[in-house]
Regions:
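Hydrophobic packing positions in regular secondary-structure scaffolds
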Residues: 1-168
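Single conserved hydrophobic/aromatic residue that forms the stacking wall/gate
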Residues: 166-177
Length: 177
């Protein structure tokens, strides 16, 4: 359980999905961090060949109403749990994905400026139920390193990175990114 909690959520689920239900529950029960166990349980519910089954929960998200200064502080906190930051996703008060944030724009903007004044409203995304093959095609088409995963209410659930697709069986060899 100690090693499992150190992994990204998608990697932990890949390992746990190989275990029997009984062993899986035993390992999960040994993890003391509720946030980690909640993420693992959520990911175990998705079919492994869907965007939900491919995604990792670790990502950076910010609120459109935050100032640049608050945003930088929150990003520092969130980034501690992420191996590699590909994108910064912008959410509204309903936790809906509304855009992405350029690191350059964030760095050069005055500290009191609001994120809603500098974010980029265009963002490609996939639905949690989209097939892994469709995700691979979209990422290849737009040359994306990462893509956010949303539910039917446009709420941000996770992200899929190019690395996840390379290591996944969800995309057929001929559609692999």
């Amino acid at each position: 359980a100690g090693e499992i909690k150190e992994l990204d959520s998608d990697d932990a689920v890949d390992i746990l999905s190989e275990l029997s239900d009984e062993k899986k529950e035993k390992v999960i029960s040994l993890i003391k961090d509720e946030n980690i166990t909640e993420n693992i349980r959520e990911l175990l519910n998705y079919d492994e060949d869907t965007a939900g089954g491919l995604m990792a929960k670790e990502l950076i998200s910010v609120n459109e109403n935050w100032s640049v200064l608050k945003c930088l502080g929150e990003i520092r906190k969130q980034a501690k749990d992420i191996t590699r930051v590909h994108s910064i996703y912008v959410l509204n008060k309903k936790e809906e994905l509304i855009g992405r944030l350029s690191l350059k724009d964030l760095i050069i903007s005055p500290s009191k400026k609001k994120i809603k004044q500098i974010y980029i409203p265009k963002v490609d995304y996939v639905n949690v139920n989209d097939s892994g093959e469709d995700v691979a095609k979209l990422m290849r088409k737009y040359d994306l390193e990462a893509i956010p995963v949303i539910n039917d209410d446009r709420q941000l659930l996770g992200r899929i990175t190019i690395c996840l697709l390379y290591t996944s069986d969800a995309a057929d060899d001929d559609t692999r990114v």
